Amino acid sequence: MKASELRAKDVAALEKEISDLLKAHFGLRMQKATQQLTNHSVIKQTRRDIARARTILTEKKKGAA
């Protein structure tokens, strides 16, 4: 997900997005552990999406304070 798409969301939507990404990341790690995952780069992309969303969430919270 692009940063511009995340910046358009409000704080509650960002928190839900982070929660969804964390669940997806967990599922991907479990697939990797059971050797069902063929494209391992998806884990890296998901991890970076989580970091991107958390960064924007922090920016929004500090901007509102």
Curated annotation (Swiss-Prot):
GO BP: any one term: translation
Gene: rpmC
Cysteine disulfide partners in this protein: none
PROSITE patterns named among the record's database cross-references: RIBOSOMAL_L29
Source organism of the structure: Leptothrix cholodnii (strain ATCC 51168 / LMG 8142 / SP-6)
Protein name: Large ribosomal subunit protein uL29
Keywords: Ribonucleoprotein, Ribosomal protein
UniProt xrefs under HAMAP family: Ribosomal_uL29
Keyword NADP tagged: no
InterPro entries assigned to the protein according to its UniProt record, in alphabetical order: Ribosomal_protein_uL29 (IPR050063), Ribosomal_uL29 (IPR001854), Ribosomal_uL29_CS (IPR018254), Ribosomal_uL29_sf (IPR036049)
One Gene Ontology CC term in the entry: cytosolic large ribosomal subunit
Annotated family: Belongs to the universal ribosomal protein uL29 family.
Gene Ontology molecular function terms on file: structural constituent of ribosome
Xref: CDD domains: Ribosomal_L29_HIP
Pfam families reported for this sequence: Ribosomal_L29
